[in-house]
Structure formats: C-alpha cells, structure tokens
C-alpha cells in the first residue's frame, strides 16, 4: 500500500503579509473589493503550487480564510448575528468583516463577535453566537468556490471542513439560555448539502476537523458524535481529524464512528502509535501527524522512520503535519540574517512540506541511499543536542540549586504591606497606569532608525530619554500617584526581553497570524536562558531621577515570555520558565539596588498556558506559580511587587492567583462592569487589587461619573483600603489626546472618593 502525505492547512497571510496589507487597504477605503479578492486568489494559487512542488500529495482546500476559519464556517452555515445582517439576508465579504471588526450594515458601530484563543495556541477565533430556534442554511459558498479554483488548476486536493460538534462546542449562547447542542440536528442538513456538492465535484476524501475530541467532553457532547456522523456518512470518505493532544481517553467513541479514516497528532499527543493501530477498524485509513505544525524545529526524520516502519503495509497510511501549518512561519529560505548553524535547526511551513515528502518517499521505497538522505537531513538537529549554543552549564547548575526558600518572600503579605505603606505613604485609592504610553510615529521612527543603523546609540538614548521625560511630566501634571516610564524603548513586551537575554533568536519574516489582519513574529528559544547584563535598569533609574513619586519597574513575566515564543522541544516548559525566572530575578535585584521600590511583573498569559485537559492543570499551575515567585521572591519586604493580568475568567484558578502572592494585582474589569471582582470577593482575596476602570481598546473617554460609579461597585466587593485605580491595560495603542482626558477623569474620580473619606 502506497503511503500518501498531506498538510492539514497552510499559512494564509503570504510571505510578505500580502493578505494583511490587502485587508487593511480595503478596510481603509484605499482599494476595491475586487482587488482584495484578487490578492486572495493569487495567494491560494501560490500556496497550492508551493505545497505541490515541495512534494505534498494532497493539498488542503478550505484552510484559507479572509479573517478566521471558524468565522468562515459560521457564514457557510448562514449563522450571522442579527446586528450584522444585510437587510435582504444576503451574505458577502463585508458581512464577514463586520462580524470580525464590529460594524452594522449602516456603518454604525455594532459589537464585534467575541474573540478567544483557538485551543491552546496563540491564534484567536471569532466565537459563533447561537440563539434558540435559529435557522441555518448554506449561506456562503467560499469552500465550494475554492475547490473549483483548485480543481481548475489541476491540483490533487482534500477539502477541509470544521466538524459540526466542534463548531457548536466553540460557540456561545446569546440571549435566553438553552443547550446549544440541540442545534446539531439543524446544522447537519447544511453539512450534508456541502458534502453532496463536494461529491458531485469528484472529491474522494474530506478532512473534517473535530479537535474537540482531544478534550474531556461532557458525556452528552461525546454521545452527539455518533448520530452526527451517521447523518454525514455515505457521500464522500471522511478523515476525522484531531490535533493538539492525544485521543486515547475518547478512543472508544471515535472507533465506533462511521468514518473512513482518522488523523492523530502524534507530536503533541502521547498516544501509542502501535496500540492505536491495533485498536482502530482494520479498513480505516490512519493519518499520523508527525511533522510539528506549531513550532519551527527541523524534524528528526530518521527517528520517525524507525517509529513508523513497523506500520507500513499494516493498513492504509498517510503522513501529515500534526495540525495546520497556520501556526508556523512560511519559508526559512527568506531568513538571511540567521547564522548557518542556527538556521540548520529550523524548518518553516514549506520546509515541513519537504520533510513530509522525504519521509514518505523513504517509507514507500526504503533503500540505503534514502536512509542516508534521512540521516543527513536529521544530522543538524541531532548535532544541536551537544551545541554550546544550547547548553550553558552555569544556568543548568543554578536551576538545579533552587530551594523552597528561593520562591518565598521574606515575610507574609501583612508584614510586607505595613513596610510598603511606611515607605511610600500613598493616599487612599492610589492611581497608576499599567505601563505603556502611546507609541507615537516619532517613537517608532526613532527605534527603527536605531535598529537599521541610521542612528547611533548615543543619539538613540538621548531621544528615548526625552520621551521618558515627557511621560513623567505628563503623569505629574495629571496627578497620578505611582508613575511609569512609558516603555518608549520597547517594540513588544516579549520581543524586547528576548532581545536582551541569551538563548533567544529572532527572525526577519517569521510572521504568524494571530487574528484577522494581526500577525506576530514570536522569538525562538534555542538554548539555556541567561541575562548577560541589566535590561530595564538604565531607563527606570533615569525616570525615577525625574520625580519624587515612585516609578514602577516594568518586566514581562516568565510564563508569558514562554507562551508567546517558539519554545525548545528538548527540555520541559517548566525548565524554560524557571530559566527565564532566574534571569529576571537578577533584574528585580538590580532594579532594587537602583532605588526602584515598585516592580510590576506582567503575566497576561498565565491562564492561556493551561493544558487542554483539566486533569493536567494542577501540575502546570504549580510550576507556573513557582516560576513567578522565583522571579519575584528576591524582593525586599518594602519593595512592592505588582502583576497585571488581562483576561475574563478567574474562578477556576483563584487558588493559583492568590498563590502568586503579588502585593498588588491589576486586572481587566471595565467591560464586565466589575463583575469579575466576584471571584476575588468569594475567594476573600487577601492582597491589593487594581480593577481596570476603563477599556483601553476603545477610543471612548470615560466620564468622571462613570469611573466613580465603577469604583463604588468595586468597593462593595473589595475593602476600599485595598483598591487601586488604573486603566484596564497598557496605553500603547491609544493617542495622547484621549489618554490625557481619560487619565484626568480617572484621577478626579479617585480624588472625589478620597474626599468622602476625610
């Protein structure tokens, strides 16, 4: 039996982020819809061709999305929120963008769909909205149109469709509550219609994605798979596709389904391939995701050959990427600044396609020459294990020497709080901001000129110092109590620290999609992490010299740096997080020596890092909390440690939030009307809290009365003496005019509440 290979999906944005640029040009009114559609057609044709040329047997179609693939599925099913609907009920590209970006058909603002993380990745999807009695119909033929495009170009294809149970699982009920699973019977006819249309086009296999099968689903959701797939069988062959974790716990349900094949992620999952092979129906095709779609490391193809060879001829077999290559940059050959050794360790999406082809060829026709080719390809990643670029004995010794004492502050919170009150003598309702101030064109230009060599270090530092001086002066004029330096020197909260730590490298074009038109370029952690010199001390010390008020030192926490980077695969995530924590622990110590008495360690990704299955949560939370404490615990009693977190669900991890033992936590609460504080109230959270009093993602300026009312609500849940007053998040993306006005109103609201206490 000949083994075939395939990818589960390919990056959409284009090597030069062509899709992003075309989207934003269209949204700004600078280009026509036809011009945007042409860019999409060109990208799809190029990506299909590139995959085919790299040796992919079956290229995916339907993985392209104008904004997000879950949103595309919503439109396919005719699921458009009423506030975004065209008057005649039609669906077009503008409908899709309105849902993603927040507009009514009239052009007036209307709430965008909620956005949240796609499983445990850094990609975000638009959450489907469901209402009782809702009707579904085939409303958007993008998938069928793209299948026609690919067939016309002569490609061997495999359409990709998000499965019905996972689609419902990912959504939320709006309005009157009901069981959204009850809508399954209503969406299945649309799926049947789509599969019928694909059958008419001569399609043999359809990849139907059901990643919810890696989760610990409630019994009623697991039971829904059987009737769903009974309804979908018979028109085409279905490759039930899972990824991001193992499926062993749901295997009994899976193997009873009327499908013809199963794709399993054997990179992220711990499934035993031999046992899986033995337990599946003999006639099923087994697709093994052996090439990591979520990281940038070259595969050890010799290793995979040894693991897979016993399966050859045991059943129909395909090899694939572990998940969609959406999460990987496109082409390593474009990276001209990486040194040769490091570059030899990497593989981006196109190189991963070539890896699949090489491994498939070797398994189909093994020979000494082919095995030598696999060994030669795998040699750099094997040589890496002994590279001095990877291993730093001092870091490894320091990590091994960590004791329980290293992760605990000297005294409990009550004693520290007394020492801090004495040192800072802050008023009731102390006001502060989260860290960053508006990144003006001038600031971005200054950094770019320095990075590209048009500006020397001395003039760059002079320019940044001037912006810090302005930020301090603005805050003093506004009457804020605890100041920040404004972060003019920072392009990104993770990249900035990665650039100053050993163990990281950066790409030129390693862009991956975050959501819509937003792309990120994660750093790559290649080895043991250490801090060669102080990172933030110079700027914090300068800012503090300009004012008698306390200035916060600003650090990104170890878990967030880990989660927002491409990590090593040869050590555990815990090891990486603790290495970062040790490096930043030294930064905390140096900030203290420089006279900085308040230090903020941001951990917005703490909750994002949770494993997919709740059974694995406790182990993760233990080391994540320990990493934060290792970072912070070196601080003296009268040094106040702040942390900032911006997400909307604390209930299920409150024990861990409290265990961080930060003196002050600032959180995002304005959009929930302070309801998030309920978790802290119920838990009787003992330390100080700064609930965000206005939404920095909106240009709207909150009134004094609005902020005052929110603070009064907060004081009903948390004792006023433990409350801080601050925005929801950093102000990097805002302009100065609305920033000044919003902060002035915030300070005035705090002053009014203080006056009541006198």
Curated annotation (Swiss-Prot):
Locate the residues binding 5-methyltetrahydropteroyltri-L-glutamate.
17-20, 117, 518-519, 564, 608
Q: Give the binding site residues for L-homocysteine.
A: 434-436, 487, 602
Keywords, A to Z? Amino-acid biosynthesis, Metal-binding, Methionine biosynthesis, Methyltransferase, Repeat, Transferase, Zinc
What class does this enzyme belong to in the EC scheme?
transferase
Pathway, per Swiss-Prot/TrEMBL? Amino-acid biosynthesis; L-methionine biosynthesis via de novo pathway; L-methionine from L-homocysteine (MetE route): step 1/1
Example of a GO biological process term? methionine biosynthetic process
The catalytic residues are 697
Q: How is the cofactor bound?
A: Binds 1 zinc ion per subunit.
- The lineage's top-level taxon is Bacteria
Looking up InterPro entries in the UniProt record yields:
Cbl-indep_Met_Synth_N (IPR013215), Cobalamin-indep_Met_synthase (IPR006276), Met_Synth_C/arc (IPR002629), UROD/MetE-like_sf (IPR038071)
> Which cofactor names does the annotation list?
Zn(2+)
NCBIfam families linked to this entry: met_syn_B12ind, PRK05222.1
Task performed by this protein:
Catalyzes the transfer of a methyl group from 5-methyltetrahydrofolate to homocysteine resulting in methionine formation.
Protein known as: 5-methyltetrahydropteroyltriglutamate--homocysteine methyltransferase
Q: What is the lineage of its organism?
A: Bacteria, Pseudomonadati, Pseudomonadota, Gammaproteobacteria, Enterobacterales
